[in-house]
Regions:
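Chalcogenol-based redox active-site neighborhoods
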Residues: 1-187
Length: 187
């Protein structure tokens, strides 16, 4: 089924997600020793990254002309993965200037699906796949299910030497996520 929607544009009436406390355990957590497939063909183990890393986590990117999952726009925090990714693309140089050594996106979609989005959106960084949910389960990340898919709720992390030092959750609106991270790093 195809529909006419532009994944880069957010509807005006999106419901805002509420802070349900589902990420409180993450600040100070050491990342698990799990390698994730990346869209650049590499395998990335976030627990072994040195320096400062930023990871933004999102449910799933849509594709122009493809139907959204059932009730997608009514799920608080679901819509906006493409604008969030574009925001991090547009703030990539700012993040580097502020000392971020690595930037990644992360979702449960396949690497092939993510690669198409990374190329279409001209992302200057890799997207990581947790398709098997091993990373998600190891960290007890908040998820939701729709149309048979288990998806991670939207958030962003600042990581220093494999330890999560700051969590942005909930993230809303998603197109301001990168700006929020830049502002926090600038403070």
């Amino acid at each position: 089924m195809t529909i006419n929607h532009d994944p880069t544009v957010l509807p005006d009436d999106l419901p805002a997600p509420q802070d349900d406390g589902a990420t409180r355990h993450l600040t100070g957590a050491r990342l698990p020793n799990i390698a994730l497939a990346a869209t650049d063909g590499s395998s990335v183990n976030l627990s072994r990254r040195t320096g400062r890393t930023v990871v933004y986590i999102y449910p799933r990117t849509g594709r122009p002309g493809q139907a959204l999952p059932t009730g997608w726009d009514g799920i608080p925090g679901a819509r906006g993965c493409t604008p969030q990714s574009c925001g991090f693309r547009d703030h990539f140089a700012d993040l580097k200037r502020l000392g971020v050594k690595q930037l990644y996106g992360l979702s449960t979609q396949t690497t092939a699906y993510q690669r198409e989005a990374a190329e279409r959106l001209h992302l200057p960084f890799a997207i990581l796949s947790d398709e098997q949910l091993a990373f998600t389960r190891a960290l007890n990340l908040p998820t939701f299910s729709v149309d048979g898919m288990t998806l991670i709720r939207r958030m962003a992390w600042v990581i220093d030497e494999g330890v999560i030092t700051h969590v942005f959750y909930p993230v809303f609106p998603p197109d301001k996520s990168a700006e929020e991270v830049v502002n926090w790093l600038s403070a």
